[in-house]
């Protein structure tokens, strides 16, 4: 009697443990053409442990197809035919024994767009298609761009490794073909630019130029590319000083070497412009005879103003360049010369005393003339006795 009483309890326990047909999968999945996507999936089905253990087979089918006759898009059953167009691209991932039906779709194609359903088979008792939970796949045009990776900033003369990758791509399907283009790559072997990685030794002239990585999937008309602008750090170069006259029409002189002497007329006004090519921009400062000039005289752009230069304002002028990758300086001698009119000109104070000097000279000359006339007259009368003495000495 006891076994008969326990039988309903055992049946009740078995019924409670009996699973049902359930499928958990995304209803809608979108992937770009040429890329891949992983669709997580899990399932359950009724199965009793005292049954025999035939192999468990799972299948993914195109919607609308008859499971008994149609080719599958993915399965773990080696005896079932797989559609040629999905062979190797649609794959089951995970352990189906652990109820994992995840589907990997690689190298997605436009014709893959559509609905798919999952089916499970085990022996004669389990043959079920989960038609109530279908996967809707949409393949859109490729808009994803490659990623270009490298350590910034690039430094002139220092080799740097660059890599290009396409987000969303996977190993399934034909391999990717990479190609690099850009002015900075001209000295490289053309075969090097066919790899996803390359080593670049940038030059100063490469700063601001474009570098492009193009990715194409072999056998498919799917191409995408990304272009980046190179930021190359380089030490100061082409240091020069240009001299401008305030009332001039252009550059009066361009100094490219140290120690050059530049003559200039006293009273002229100049602008001195110090220029240098570097990245990042260098810090410029002006010195006269080794001493830093007042910041109010200079500007951030390296321009120095010298208004109405005096005779004592010449000397050695130096432009110094400070940069993380190196420093430079350039000097010249400013020789101030008196103008030709300064030899015959006097100051305003001196010009005011000229009338008095002329008056004194004029008075002195008049006095000297008077004294000379008086002296000659006195000598004449003294020696000759005058007119009366001359008449007395005449004979009767």
Curated annotation (Swiss-Prot):
SMART domains hit by this protein: IG (SM00409), IGc2 (SM00408)
Binding site for N-acetylneuraminate: 119
Predominant subcellular localization, coarse grouping: membrane
Signal peptide: 1-16
Gene Ontology terms for molecular function: carbohydrate binding; sialic acid binding
Pfam families assigned: C2-set_2 (PF08205), Ig_2 (PF13895), V-set (PF07686)
Annotated glycosylation sites: 231
Parts of the chain that traverse the membrane: 359-381
Gene3D superfamilies per UniProt: Immunoglobulins
Tissue: Mainly expressed in hematopoietic tissues including bone marrow, spleen and fetal liver. Also detected in lung and testis.
Cystines in this chain: 164-213, 274-319
Residue stretches making up the Ig-like C2-type domain: 146-229, 236-331
Stretches of the chain found on the membrane's Extracellular side: 17-358
Annotated InterPro entries: CD80_C2-set (IPR013162), Ig-like_dom (IPR007110), Ig-like_dom_sf (IPR036179), Ig-like_fold (IPR013783), Ig/MHC_CS (IPR003006), Ig_sub (IPR003599), Ig_sub2 (IPR003598), Ig_V-set (IPR013106)
Compartments it resides in: Cell membrane
Ig-like V-type domain residues: 19-136
Family: Belongs to the immunoglobulin superfamily. SIGLEC (sialic acid binding Ig-like lectin) family.
Protein name listed in UniProt: Sialic acid-binding Ig-like lectin 14
């Amino acid at each position: 009697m006891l076994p008969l009483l326990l039988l309903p309890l055992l049946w009740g326990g078995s019924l409670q443990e009996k699973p049902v047909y359930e499928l958990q999968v995304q209803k809608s999945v979108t992937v770009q053409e040429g890329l891949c996507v992983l669709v997580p999936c899990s399932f359950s089905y009724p199965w009793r442990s005292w049954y025999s253990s035939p192999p468990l087979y799972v299948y993914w089918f195109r919607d609308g197809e008859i499971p008994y006759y149609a080719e599958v898009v993915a399965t773990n059953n080696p005896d079932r035919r797989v559609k040629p167009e999905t062979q190797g691209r649609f794959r089951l991932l995970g352990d189906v024994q652990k109820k994992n039906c995840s589907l990997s779709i690689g190298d997605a194609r436009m014709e893959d767009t559509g609905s798919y359903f999952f089916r499970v088979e085990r022996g004669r008792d389990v043959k079920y298609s989960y038609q109530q939970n279908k996967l809707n796949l949409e393949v859109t045009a490729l808009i994803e761009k490659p990623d270009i990776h490298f350590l910034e900033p690039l430094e002139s003369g220092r080799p740097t490794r660059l890599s290009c990758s396409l987000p969303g791509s996977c190993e399934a399907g034909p391999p990717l073909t990479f190609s690099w283009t850009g002015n900075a790559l001209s000295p490289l072997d053309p075969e090097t630019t066919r790899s996803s990685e390359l080593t670049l030794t940038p030059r100063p002239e490469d700063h601001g130029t474009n570098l492009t990585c193009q990715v194409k999937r072999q056998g498919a008309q799917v191409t995408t590319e990304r272009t980046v602008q190179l930021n190359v750090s380089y030490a100061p170069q082409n240091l020069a000083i240009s001299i401008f006259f305030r009332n001039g029409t252009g550059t009066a002189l361009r100094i490219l070497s140290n120690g050059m002497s530049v003559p200039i007329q006293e009273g002229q006004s100049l602008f001195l412009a110090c220029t240098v090519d570097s990245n990042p921009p260098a810090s410029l400062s002006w010195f006269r005879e080794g001493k830093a000039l007042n910041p109010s005289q200079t500007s951030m752009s390296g321009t120095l103003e010298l208004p109405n230069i005096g005779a004592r304002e010449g000397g050695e002028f130096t432009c110094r360049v400070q940069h993380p990758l190196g420093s430079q300086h350039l000097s010249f001698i400013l020789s101030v010369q008196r103008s030709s009119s300064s030899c015959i000109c006097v100051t305003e104070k001196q010009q005011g005393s000229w009338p008095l000097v002329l008056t004194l000279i004029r008075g002195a000359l008049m006095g000297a003339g008077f004294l000379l006339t008086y002296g000659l007259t006195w000598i004449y009368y003294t020696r000759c006795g005058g007119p009366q003495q001359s008449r007395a000495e005449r004979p009767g």
